[in-house]
């Protein structure tokens, strides 16, 4: 069985004085080996974290003990290695950034559709199916027949709707995203724009892959995830992708065989797009990563800081011994 539990969670709820949650939440995560990032805002909480079973259970218990966060929505998958290097709790204006004022899924939202009912909905020729994720995510996998809005960030989605969709023409709209949170915002936005029948996949793609057998599935490809696994397959296991450390886009084994690929410096998607200064910086970073690997250490994250401190302490102790022997 995989060693780490990866937990994606969110809840839209009014969090007055949300800033006060940051320190106790961060302290609990650090004390129980929970890595990843949580976002706090006045509209709620969102994030993905990973830890051993005990760490995730402790975090979820803490969140459910907070009255405003009780009943938080979460989905679990698994990883053989820790997919995050750091532990962060960030304060934000929005927990998922649409960039449109006044959109509140707590008051207006689309109709939730269970994974078991999703196939029938998107097979309906009268339903316009939209993937609300970014272009690089959709490139890895999507639902059969879904429209790609060709967005680089979620902030671009409202412009896509304004330029390409019409409430009179698109009377039934079905939307989906990785874990469900982007659709909370996007369906709320579309309802505000006058679209009447707006549906979204409850629990997102991850819940669909978990509950719908692959032989019945309308999902094609793999699912991009925002952690070290890069993507997961239909069994929610790590798929055959890595991340280019220069552009942070997913790459395949074929990409790595390209002449334009240099580990940590470039890939076919970003080759020639970085300045000479950036390339030099990437090469130096890759050199430090390699040196850390030789020492059996991490180059980034909380553990790397501890390892550097330990190395410095050992050097100082050695110098002290040499001084006393002199």
Curated annotation (Swiss-Prot):
Keywords: Oxidoreductase, tRNA processing
Gene3D superfamilies: 3.30.70.100, Rhodanese-like domain
SMART domains xrefs: RHOD
Single biological process term from Gene Ontology: tRNA modification
Region Disordered, residue ranges: 293-326
Enzyme category, top tier: oxidoreductase
Cystine pairs: none
Known EC number: 1.14.-.-
Basic and acidic residues bias spans: 311-326
Gene Ontology molecular functions: oxidoreductase activity, acting on paired donors, with incorporation or reduction of molecular oxygen
Active site: 177 (cysteine persulfide intermediate)
Domain Rhodanese residues, every copy: 123-217
SUPFAM superfamilies: Rhodanese/Cell cycle control phosphatase
Catalytic activity: uridine(34) in tRNA + AH2 + O2 = 5-hydroxyuridine(34) in tRNA + A + H2O
Pfam families in alphabetical order: Rhodanese, UPF0176_N
Assigned protein family: Belongs to the TrhO family.
Function of the protein: Catalyzes oxygen-dependent 5-hydroxyuridine (ho5U) modification at position 34 in tRNAs.
UniProt name for this protein: tRNA uridine(34) hydroxylase
């Amino acid at each position: 069985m995989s060693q780490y539990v990866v937990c994606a969670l969110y809840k839209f709820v009014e969090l007055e004085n949300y800033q006060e949650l940051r320190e106790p939440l961060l302290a609990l995560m650090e004390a129980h080996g929970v890595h990843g990032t949580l976002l706090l805002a006045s509209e709620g909480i969102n994030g993905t974290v990973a830890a051993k079973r005990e760490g995730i259970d402790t975090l979820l218990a803490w969140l459910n003990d907070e009255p405003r966060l009780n009943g938080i929505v979460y989905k679990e998958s698994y990883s053989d290695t820790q997919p995050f290097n750091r532990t962060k709790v960030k304060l934000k204006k929005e927990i998922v950034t649409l960039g449109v004022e006044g959109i509140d899924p707590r008051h207006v939202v689309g109709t939730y559709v269970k994974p078991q009912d999703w196939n029938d909905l998107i097979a309906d020729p009268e339903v316009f199916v939209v993937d609300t994720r970014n272009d690089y995510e959709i490139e890895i996998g999507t639902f059969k027949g879904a429209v790609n809005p060709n967005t680089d960030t979620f902030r671009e989605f409202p412009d896509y709707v304004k330029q390409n969709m019409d409430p009179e023409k698109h009377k039934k709209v079905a939307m989906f995203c990785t874990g469900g949170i982007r659709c909370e915002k996007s369906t709320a936005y579309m309802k505000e724009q006058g679209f009447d029948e707006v549906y979204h996949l409850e629990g997102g793609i991850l819940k669909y892959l978990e509950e719908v057998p692959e032989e019945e599935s309308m999902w094609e490809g793999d699912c991009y995830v925002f952690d070290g696994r890069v993507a997961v397959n239909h069994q929610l296991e790590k798929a055959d992708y890595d991340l280019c450390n220069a552009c942070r886009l997913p790459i395949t084994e074929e990409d790595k065989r390209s002449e334009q690929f240099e580990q940590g410096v470039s890939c076919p998607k970003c080759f020639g797009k970085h300045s000479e200064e950036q390339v030099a910086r990437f090469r130096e970073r890759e050199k430090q990563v390699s040196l850390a690997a030789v020492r059996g250490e991490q180059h980034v994250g909380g553990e790397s800081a501890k390892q550097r401190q330990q190395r410095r302490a050992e050097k100082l102790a050695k110098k002290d011994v040499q001084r006393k022997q002199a």
